[in-house]
Each structure stands twice: as structure tokens, then as C-alpha cells.
């Protein structure tokens, strides 16, 4: 779809959406996003220029359907997929991608660490994806040296990053905010470093006793991203991995560095979003969102959860969706889903479905709470269908129509029950929605109440 849009830009030194927005240009991608979001195109341009919105759109991802992540747009959901050394393959990951898109993923991250040729897996996913694809390049850096990350040089990291750009990756998680001086701050934590990318960089720093190469070569990464319009997802290497560690000095020290890096990228018109926690008690979620906005000059915030309790392995799509809904309400732009398998294993297709639906609920609830225009229209339409016992319309309006129909049909499968004025919960005689109060009923009641009031 984008081939004709991109052709005139190829070969230019800077092809980012932010670069064009700051020149006053409304690109085809911005116009497409404006129609998707039902917002004025000049507002989209201005938000991208300001850095409060990103449109992840690598010029080599030509089959992309552009979307926006930012406070002015609807709250978005990211789904993680990816093969591991112990499970999955190309075909399975492409099927997970298709399932994620089916159930509403706005972006998808390929977090493959094994299971085959990582370049082939990534290319297959990008070629099949209408949504932006994100990656974590240090995973491939580690895989390429068979787990001996200390063997990598800064140039090796840059080579992997540029390769991902060439393949069409729309945004990359770059763990540049973890500084050597931050590492002693994790000593008082229960779970230390829980970011895989952060752990890889920490290994390199501890071995060489040198500063993080992604930090020292950050401007080199910017130059690469400018040529492809790849967006930064600045990784939170020191995000808390349990409630005890939330909002500690390690996390907030890195956040300050991420804010500085955000502004450096903006100086070169490169788009940035900032990743966040993690595991956070409910009473600290608002603080975390506000603090990110303050430190990072309102760059879009993108959180993993956060989980609001640590005692529910197997149900962390629920513990995290609670925190995600709150974070979205307070202004987080994108929610990274968590599946029931979090902390336990690699998610399968059903886990992807359950995680995505939980997060679509959270994002939608946040949009309603933030009074985004039209956010509640679908809810009201479904409520009218429910009151009218229009079962098929209820199913169609659901976030997961197949699941809604499946649960209804477990006890009342016959077609005749699709027009019945009851379900198996109340049965035919006890459904309160059968009590229809008409205008005539209310008029008669008002007359009675007026008469009764006069007698009193």
C-alpha cells in the first residue's frame, strides 16, 4: 500500500515522520492515521512534530497500515510473539501474528531468541504483518555469539540494529538508558534485573567495566534510524520485577537517562516512545505515569502491565490488565500485553488470545475513562442489543465474538434461543430485562404520584 508514498523519499538523509511533520508536511501516513483515529490531520502532524505521538512506519515495511501511538489517539495494545530455542518455528510464529492481529493487536513485537534462523523468522513476520513490528536487537546479538555477549563490540551491536532496519522493523527496543553507575543500585532489590535486554547489556558492562555501548553510540543509532524511519522504543532495563522493587532509585535513575536520550533523538527528528514497568502496586501507578511524562517530556509511554500483585502465576493476564487499565487512564499511550503464561513459559495461540482480549478490555476501559470521543459508542450499542435480546448482535459487537457465542451456546445451542428473551442464567421466567417499562406506564405512574402527593 505504501510503495508509492515512500518512493519519493528514498535516498533522503532523513525520512522520519517527525522530520516531515516539523517541516509542516502532512504525509500520507499522517492522513491515513487521522482517518483511522477520526482526528484532524493537522493535529496528527502537530503531535508527531511535538514528540507526543509516534507513527512507527519503516520505509521498508511497505504493506504496513499506519497507526499512531500517543496521548491524543486511542490507547493501543502490543502483543509479543517469538520463537525460543526450546519451542516454536517460523510457521507457528506467523500463525501467532495472524491471531494477534485478528484479536486486535495494534503492534506486534518479535522477541525470537532461537527456534531457527532469526532473520528468516523476522522477515516472514514483517512480510505477513499489516501492523508495526518491533524487535529487541540485543537478542540477536546474543544469539549470534552463542551466548557470549562479552565478545560483541559496539560495531557488532550497530550491525544488528541496521540489519533489523533494512528488513523493515518499525521500532526497536534499545537498552541505552542502563549506565554503568546504575548497576550498584540494584543491590537492595529482590529480583535484580528482569529485563532480558537489560540483563544482556549488564553482562557486557560488568565484563568489560566500560559504559553501555548503546549509550556511548546512541548518536550512531540515531543516524541509522533516520535513514529508515525506525522509531526508538527506549528500553527500561531496570524496570521492577516485583512489587518490592517498584519505583526505586535504580528504576528512576534510568528513567532520567531515558528522558535525556529522548531529547537527543528529537534533536535529529527521530521518533521515540519510552518503555515502562513492570510490577507496580496500584497506589504507585499514577506516580509512575506522571514521572515518565515529566522526565521524558511527554514522549509516549509504553508499559508492560503493570502487574499489581505477584502471587498469581497462571493468571498474570488479569493481575496486569488491572494495572494496565489504570496506567491507560492516567495517560499511558500503549499497553504491552501479558499472557497467562507470563513467568511460566512460552505462550501458545490460546495464551495469545487470552492476553490480547484482557488488554483490549483494559485499553478500551482507559479510553472510556479518558472520555475519548466515541469511545463508549460500541458499549451503548451492545447494551441496546442486550436489552432487546438481540443475541447475534451482542456476539458481533463483543471483543471476542467467538467466545461470547461459545459460552451462550454451551447451554442453549439451538437457533431458536438466538431470539429467546432469556439466557440459561435466569431462565424464561426470571430475567429482569423482560420487564419493559413503557412511556405509557411512566405517564400513569407520574399521575398517581402527583395525586398521592396532593393528598399528602
Swiss-Prot record:
It comes from the Bacteria. One of its GO terms (molecular function) is zinc ion binding. [4Fe-4S] cluster binds at residues 423, 426, 431. Zn(2+) binds at residues 279, 343. It holds the Pfam family ThiC_Rad_SAM. GO terms for biological process: thiamine biosynthetic process; thiamine diphosphate biosynthetic process. Its EC number is 4.1.99.17. Binds 1 [4Fe-4S] cluster per subunit. The cluster is coordinated with 3 cysteines and an exchangeable S-adenosyl-L-methionine. Its cofactor is [4Fe-4S] cluster. Keywords: 4Fe-4S, Iron, Iron-sulfur, Lyase, Metal-binding, S-adenosyl-L-methionine, Thiamine biosynthesis, Zinc. Pathway: Cofactor biosynthesis; thiamine diphosphate biosynthesis. The keyword Metal-binding applies. GO terms for cellular component: cytosol. Substrate binds at residues 80, 109, 139, 175, 195-197, 236-239, 275, 302. It catalyses: 5-amino-1-(5-phospho-beta-D-ribosyl)imidazole + S-adenosyl-L-methionine = 4-amino-2-methyl-5-(phosphooxymethyl)pyrimidine + CO + 5'-deoxyadenosine + formate + L-methionine + 3 H(+). Belongs to the ThiC family. Catalyzes the synthesis of the hydroxymethylpyrimidine phosphate (HMP-P) moiety of thiamine from aminoimidazole ribotide (AIR) in a radical S-adenosyl-L-methionine (SAM)-dependent reaction. This is Phosphomethylpyrimidine synthase. It comes from Synechococcus sp. (strain ATCC 27144 / PCC 6301 / SAUG 1402/1) (Anacystis nidulans). The lineage of its organism: Bacteria, Bacillati, Cyanobacteriota, Cyanophyceae, Synechococcales.
Amino acid at each position: 500500500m505504501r510503495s508509492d508514498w515512500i518512493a519519493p523519499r528514498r535516498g533522503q538523509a532523513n525520512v522520519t515522520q517527525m522530520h516531515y511533520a516539523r517541516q509542516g508536511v502532512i504525509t500520507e501516513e499522517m492522513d491515513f492515521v487521522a482517518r483511522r483515529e477520526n482526528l484532524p490531520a493537522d493535529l496528527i502532524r502537530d503531535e508527531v512534530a511535538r514528540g507526543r505521538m509516534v507513527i512507527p512506519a519503516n520505509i521498508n515495511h511497505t504493506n504496513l497500515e499506519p497507526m499512531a501511538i500517543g496521548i491524543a489517539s486511542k490507547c493501543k495494545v502490543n502483543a509479543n510473539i517469538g520463537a525460543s530455542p526450546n519451542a516454536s518455528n517460523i510457521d507457528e510464529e506467523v500463525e501467532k501474528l495472524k491471531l494477534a492481529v485478528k484479536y486486535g493487536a495494534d503492534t506486534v513485537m518479535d522477541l525470537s531468541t532461537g527456534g531457527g534462523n532469526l532473520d528468516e523468522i523476522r522477515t516472514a513476520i514483517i512480510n505477513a504483518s499489516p501492523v508495526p513490528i518491533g524487535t529487541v536487537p540485543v537478542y540477536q546479538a546474543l544469539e549470534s555469539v552463542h551466548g557470549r555477549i562479552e565478545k560483541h563490540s559496539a560495531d557488532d551491536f550497530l550491525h544488528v540494529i541496521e540489519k533489523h532496519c533494512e528488513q523493515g522493523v518499525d521500532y526497536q527496543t534499545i537498552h541505552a538508558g542502563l549506565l554503568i553507575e546504575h548497576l550498584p543500585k540494584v543491590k537492595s532489590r529482590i529480583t535484580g534485573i528482569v529485563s532480558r535486554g537489560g540483563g544482556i547489556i549488564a553482562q557486557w558492562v560488568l565484563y568489560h567495566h566500560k559504559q553501555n555501548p548503546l549509550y556511548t553510540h546512541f548518536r550512531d543509532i540515531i543516524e541509522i534510524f533516520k535513514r529508515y524511519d525506525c522509531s526508538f522504543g527506549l528500553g527500561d532495563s531496570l524496570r521492577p520485577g516485583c512489587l518490592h522493587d517498584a519505583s526505586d532509585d535504580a528504576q528512576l535513575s534510568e528513567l532520567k537517562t531515558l528522558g535525556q536520550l529522548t531529547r537527543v533523538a528529537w534533536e535529529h527528528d527521530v521518533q521515540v516512545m519510552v518503555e515502562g514497568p513492570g510490577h507496580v502496586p496500584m497506589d504507585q501507578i499514577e506516580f509512575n505515569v506522571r514521572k515518565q511524562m515529566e522526565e521524558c517530556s511527554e514522549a509516549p509511554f509504553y508499559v508492560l502491565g503493570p502487574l499489581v500483585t505477584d502471587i498469581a502465576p497462571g493468571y498474570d493476564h488479569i493481575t496486569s490488565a488491572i494495572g494496565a487499565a489504570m496506567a491507560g487512564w492516567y495517560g499511558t499511550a500503549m499497553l504491552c500485553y501479558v499472557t497467562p503464561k507470563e513467568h511460566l513459559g512460552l505462550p501458545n495461540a490460546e495464551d495469545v488470545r487470552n492476553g490480547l482480549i484482557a488488554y483490549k478490555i483494559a485499553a478500551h476501559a482507559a479510553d472510556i475513562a479518558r472520555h475519548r470521543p466515541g469511545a463508549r459508542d460500541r458499549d451503548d450499542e451492545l447494551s441496546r442489543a442486550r436489552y432487546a435480546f438481540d443475541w447475534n448482535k451482542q456476539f458481533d459487537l463483543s471483543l471476542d465474538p467467538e467466545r461470547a457465542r461459545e459460552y451462550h451456546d454451551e447451554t442453549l445451542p439451538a437457533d431458536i434461543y438466538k431470539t429467546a428473551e432469556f439466557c440459561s442464567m435466569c431462565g424464561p421466567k426470571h430475567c429482569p430485562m423482560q420487564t419493559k417499562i413503557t412511556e405509557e406506564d411512566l405517564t400513569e405512574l407520574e399521575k398517581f404520584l402527583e395525586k398521592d402527593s396532593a393528598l399528602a
